[in-house]
Amino acid sequence: MGKNQPGYFGEFGGRYAPEILTEALEELESTYQKLKKSKKFKKELEFYLQNYVGRPSPLTYAERLTKQWGGARIWLKREDLNHTGAHKINNAIGQALIAKFMGKKRIIAETGAGQHGLATATVGAMFGMETVVYMGAVDVERQNLNAKKIEMLGAKILPVTAGEATLKEATSEAMRDWALNVSTTHYIVGSAIGPHPFPTIVRDLQSIIGKEARSQFKKRNHNLPHAIVACVGGGSNAIGMFHAFLKDKHVAIYGAEAGGLGPKPGEHSATLTYGKTGFLHGTKTLIIQDEAGQIVPAHSVSAGLDYPGVGPEHAYLSQTKRVDYRMVTDEQALDCFLEVTRVEGIIPALETAHAFYVARDVAKDLGKKKDLIICLSGRGDKDVTEVLRILGERSK
């Protein structure tokens, strides 16, 4: 597969997976190419997105936050209002339908914050498919509510204790499972990561976020926003938000990644700031690694951003400088989590709180009479217990 072929974004992307998965990846790619042109598939996907997920999600003007920050007008693309509470369901439904068309009876997923696991367990229940979710043991603890919901939906949750016991290890275990059960199983990759065609499939299924936001904003304001902001872990909500605006050169695009506790290796998940080119989970991308090329453990207060790699398209957008990626520390994200909750009456996910922090700076720089859209990727019910625990420790 050459760099100019599908699956590459500049030098990033491609398919670097074990040979045992080659046939499955080729089958997935050819099926997806057919389904993209199929009216039946499009109609079915649209039906579920409207009648089950509740799309289109609203574009909300955040009046009090706009006043509080004293800069650009703030708009929120409300992925938190989707069924299951985040953007992850857009992708899970699409991939479950692909699995159904391929005749696969079993679906598996990896999950960090639990939102993708929850979305996969939800579509598994709806389509009557056997569902297994791999989740790092550390994440099972800090995202216990989502872990319980996944089990309640009838999916089997398998805690992963290897390594850091977070998202990277959960992804590795899910890939191992897929390699062993490839004839019966489809792996619903949850972010815009992995070997081709996954980054493209996930991007396409999430691109509804940006398409809707662009048309909703245009309808109300007869122009486009001056800036858009989203948080980036693997980067599926962000690439879904960004994709529709990439050709609009006058729209500034910002990504917020996890600066964690600081710049030392092992303290953050800021792949686009500190990452070097390497290979992880079947793709060529930017990865947090040491001098010897070993992957360094990632850290973030938010389980969904706790990943030492990033989607290859984000690596490309960073390299070409189309998107400005900025780091946000745990502390800064927590402060924004509380501010947005108290000012707007919306509890954002800790992941999204990183985007709010970048948006606050950008809004002040833009000044009044300008407009900024934040992708509110998910709601923060799942984070309340963890935030209260951290605040309790702060006050000791």
UniProtKB/Swiss-Prot annotation:
Q: Tell me which cofactor or cofactors this protein depends on.
A: pyridoxal 5'-phosphate
InterPro entries named among the record's database cross-references: Trp_synth_b_CS (IPR006653), Trp_synth_beta (IPR006654), Trp_synth_beta/beta-like (IPR023026), TrpB-like_PALP (IPR001926), TrpB-like_PALP_sf (IPR036052)
Enzyme Commission no: 4.2.1.20
Keyword Amino-acid biosynthesis found: yes
Q: Does the keyword Amino-acid biosynthesis apply?
A: yes
Keywords in UniProt for this one? Amino-acid biosynthesis, Aromatic amino acid biosynthesis, Lyase, Pyridoxal phosphate, Tryptophan biosynthesis
Quote the pathway field: Amino-acid biosynthesis; L-tryptophan biosynthesis; L-tryptophan from chorismate: step 5/5
Major enzyme class = lyase
Which region is the signal sequence?
A: none
Give all N6-(pyridoxal phosphate)lysine modified positions. K88
Q: What PROSITE patterns does its record include?
A: TRP_SYNTHASE_BETA
A single GO cellular-component term from the record reads:
cytoplasm
Q: Name one GO molecular function term.
A: tryptophan synthase activity
Task: Check the record and name the Pfam families matching this protein.
Answer: PALP
Q: What domain of life does the UniProt record list for this protein's source?
A: Bacteria
Q: Which reaction does it catalyse?
A: (1S,2R)-1-C-(indol-3-yl)glycerol 3-phosphate + L-serine = D-glyceraldehyde 3-phosphate + L-tryptophan + H2O
Entry-linked SUPFAM superfamilies: Tryptophan synthase beta subunit-like PLP-dependent enzymes
Q: Which PANTHER family match?
A: TRYPTOPHAN SYNTHASE, TRYPTOPHAN SYNTHASE-RELATED
Assembly? Tetramer of two alpha and two beta chains.
Main function: The beta subunit is responsible for the synthesis of L-tryptophan from indole and L-serine.
Q: Family assignment?
A: Belongs to the TrpB family.
Annotated protein name in UniProt: Tryptophan synthase beta chain
